[in-house]
Amino acid sequence: MENSPRYREATNLIPSPRCHNSNNSCGMSSSSESNKPPTTPTRHVTTRSESGNPYPTTFVQADTSSFKQVVQMLTGSAERPKHGSSLKPNPTHHQPDPRSTPSSFSIPPIKAVPNKKQSSSSASGFRLYERRNSMKNLKINPLNPVFNPVNSAFSPRKPEILSPSILDFPSLVLSPVTPLIPDPFDRSGSSNQSPNELAAEEKAMKERGFYLHPSPATTPMDPEPRLLPLFPVTSPRVSGSSSASTS
């Protein structure tokens, strides 16, 4: 009876104790597999990583209907929009390895720490801008009580002295009066000319169109400059040969 085919089939259906300890449902898998119809191969993800390559290559098998969803699932960011979170992924798809997806390497946002140097520089720049605008619209009036030396720190002088020098501004200090003296740079000698010479000079200006300034006799005259010949009359070769022949 032990050699009959029915007894052999019954012994094959008895689950093994090893399988019973690991999973209770694996004992009936052999009988259920014979009754299941042939199913289509599920989509799987294979990862091929080379030694020393931090970015492994992922191969995904998908059809045209779910290709877009698989690409978004593998390359999408960790924070998806609200309308994308409501869509549930297809249970037939295998979840990719979280170590191979870039979403696991999310960098935390950097907290903006206020810099003291930047705040101080911006405050100083704002103060400088205000100071420039106030200097553009500045109007100085010595009679104004604002510029009174009692109320201001420009000068500790008496308030009855109303002059531009009370503000201690160099540009407002009055310049000294220059006395009216003969021009030392006037070399025309018009002050030493007689009325006859002035009349002759005016006549020459009307007739000839130039000024008549006679040079004083006391001016030392330089000797006439020596004029060098531009084109020599004799050749140096000829002069050298003639001198050699005479010697």
Swiss-Prot record:
GO biological process: defense response; negative regulation of cellular defense response; negative regulation of DNA-binding transcription factor activity
Region spans: Disordered: 1-128, 184-247
Residues annotated with Phosphoserine modification: 16, 106, 155, 163, 165, 175, 194, 215, 235, 239, 243
Job description of the protein: Acts as a negative regulator of WRKY33 transcription factor activity in the promotion of defense gene expression. Acts as a negative regulator of pathogen-associated molecular pattern (PAMP)-induced responses to modulate resistance to pathogens.
Modification comment: Phosphorylated on serine and threonine residues by MPK6 following treatment with the pathogen-associated molecular pattern (PAMP) flg22. MAP kinase-mediated phosphorylation after PAMP elicitation causes degradation of VQ4, allowing WRKY33 to promote transcription from defense genes.
Ranges of biased composition (kind: Basic and acidic residues): 200-210
Motif VQ location, chain numbering: 67-76
Gene Ontology annotations for the cellular component aspect, listed alphabetically: nucleus
Protein's recorded name: VQ motif-containing protein 4
Residue list for modification Phosphothreonine: 178, 219, 234
Subunit structure: Interacts with MPK3 and MPK6.
Keyword Nucleus: yes
Biased composition (Polar residues): 48-75, 87-106, 236-247
The keyword Nucleus belongs to this UniProt entry's keyword annotation: yes
Main location: nucleus
Taxonomic source organism: Arabidopsis thaliana (Mouse-ear cress)
UniProt subcellular location: Nucleus
Highest taxon listed in the record's lineage: Eukaryota
Sorted UniProt keywords: Nucleus, Phosphoprotein, Plant defense
Low complexity bias locations: 21-37
